[in-house]
Structures are given as structure tokens and as C-alpha cells.
Regions:
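ABC family nucleotide-binding domain
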Residues: 18-249
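ABC-family P-loop ATPase nucleotide-binding domain
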Residues: 1-27
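C-terminal boundary and immediately downstream tail of ABC-type ATPase nucleotide-binding domains
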Residues: 2-5, 237-240, 250-269
């Protein structure tokens, strides 16, 4: 380490065999509360990993650190073999290179619990905003692709409406289309169905299932046990900022080793 910079090289070290996402010994505190206590996780291209745990276990914080919406206190995050550089700032750790963070975010899309659509824009405008203004792609091309993506998630007929005129399930599907429009290598889902009425959950899960079948790399924080069992190829259970259980769905659901995970499963049936 030099000049106060951690995990930074001038030229990113990229390996063809590198995981799509790698998190090593990640730690994050808010004040005196340590939320992540040395979490490690690795996702290969095409992995669908469901991240389970009770409220406050650190699931969402981990996703937000991967996308640098929160800056970890220590640890290493690698996206496609490129290590995100951190350095000590006046208020704690900060990105060593904001342009690197911007580049990483263009490859790692996040779908939020609360949709995060821009209320003053139509659904179509929401989807094309970043491709046009961040990626500088031709507007006509972005519109054509956006309409295909909205068709894919089943709401192309809503393209000229504003978010407030859509149901929660439709808004979340629009948010997924917006994420896909950036051509991400990795998709992060932060409890994408928890804000929805029960009858709307299925329509969002169907879209997510189809994305998994396409071979997309997905990290999904969820309480949907059926999705975790049937769609994921790996399940990670966090408890108080630590990975308590990890493995294939058949293993962790069929013969859980952790007593806490057993209790968690029984409380979510």
C-alpha cells in the first residue's frame, strides 16, 4: 500500500478466468454499528446467487458496497477481475478514482426495492436516460432497444405513461428494463418484490426467472424462498454481518448446517 491507496493498480489486472464479482473480507460500519464483519463472496459469469437473511443482517449493505453506493471500510471488491481502488479520505475510505467507479457502475446494474424511477419522466424516458446521456449512444437506437426491453418485461403498452400511473409490479418491471438498457455484466437486485402487494410479486419473479434462464449473472437479496430454491444455483445466508451458510439450494435447504438458517427457513414457509 502506498500514498494511502488500497487495492489499486495503475492498470487494472483482468483475467479471462476472473469471477464476474468477487468480494473478499468486506467490512462496513455505520458509526459504532459494524454491519459487515468480513464478508466474502464470489460469483462466476451466469451465477444466480440468492442472498438471504433477517432484516439488519447486512444483505443490502453488501450489494450497495459492490456498486459503491456505500464505500466499505476495508476489504476488496473485484468486478470482472478489476479491483476497485479505495483510499483514506478525511471522512473515512473513499474511491481512489471516481472515473473507475463510474465505469464499474455502467457494468453493474442495480434494481432497488423502491423502484427509483424518475417520476417526471415517462417509462420510455426512464429507460433511455442513462444509455443516451451516460453512454452517449444514439437516441433512436436507444428508443428502439427500450421498446424491445419493455416488450420483454410485458409493459410496452405503458411506455408513454408516468410511473405514478403504473402498479408497483409494473414499475419494478420498468426498473428492470431500465437496468437492462445499460447492457450490464452483473445485475444486483435489492429485495425487488418486498414493496409489492402479494398479487404483484409473481409478475416480477417471472421476469427475473427469464433473465436467469438467459444466463445473466445475478445477485439477489430476497425473502422469496421459492425463487431461491428453484432459480438460484447458490444460496448465501447472512447473519449479523457474517456468512452463516452457503451452498447449492439442494444442500442448504435440504440439509442446513446452521441452526439459525433452519430457524430462518421455518419462519419463511
Amino acid at each position: 500500500m502506498s500514498n494511502g491507496v488500497a487495492s489499486l493498480s495503475t492498470q487494472p489486472a483482468v483475467s479471462e478466468a476472473a469471477p464476474a464479482v468477487s468480494v473478499n473480507n468486506l467490512r462496513k460500519s455505520f458509526g459504532n454499528l459494524e454491519v459487515l464483519k468480513g464478508v466474502s463472496l464470489s460469483a462466476r459469469e451466469g451465477d444466480v446467487i440468492s442472498i438471504l437473511g433477517a432484516s439488519g443482517s447486512g444483505k443490502s449493505t453488501m450489494l450497495r458496497c459492490i456498486n459503491m453506493l456505500e464505500v466499505p471500510d476495508s476489504g476488496e471488491i473485484r468486478i470482472g477481475g478489476e479491483t476497485i481502488g479505495l483510499r483514506k479520505g478525511r471522512k473515512g475510505m473513499e474511491p481512489a478514482d471516481q472515473s473507475q467507479v463510474d465505469r464499474i457502475r455502467s457494468r453493474v446494474a442495480m434494481v432497488f426495492q423502491s423502484f427509483n424511477l424518475w417520476s417526471h419522466m415517462t417509462i420510455l424516458e426512464n429507460v433511455i436516460e442513462a444509455p443516451v446521456h451516460v453512454q452517449k449512444r444514439p437516441k433512436a437506437e436507444c428508443i428502439a432497444e427500450a421498446e424491445e426491453l419493455l416488450k420483454k418485461v410485458g409493459i410496452v403498452d405503458k411506455r408513454n405513461q408516468y410511473p405514478s400511473h403504473l402498479s408497483g409490479g409494473q414499475q419494478q418491471r420498468a426498473a428492470i428494463a431500465r437496468a437492462l438498457a445499460m447492457h450490464p455484466k452483473v445485475m444486483l437486485f435489492d429485495e425487488p418484490t418486498s414493496a409489492l402487494d402479494p398479487e404483484l410479486v409473481g409478475e416480477v419473479l417471472r421476469v427475473m426467472r427469464s433473465l436467469a434462464e438467459e444466463g445473466r449473472t445475478m445477485l439477489v437479496v430476497t425473502h422469496e424462498m421459492g425463487f431461491a430454491r428453484d432459480v438460484s444455483n447458490r444460496v448465501v445466508f447472512l447473519h449479523k454481518g457474517v456468512v452463516e451458510e452457503e451452498g447449492a439450494p439442494t444442500e442448504v435447504f435440504g440439509a442446513p448446517k446452521s441452526e439459525r438458517f433452519k430457524q430462518f427457513i421455518s419462519s419463511h414457509r
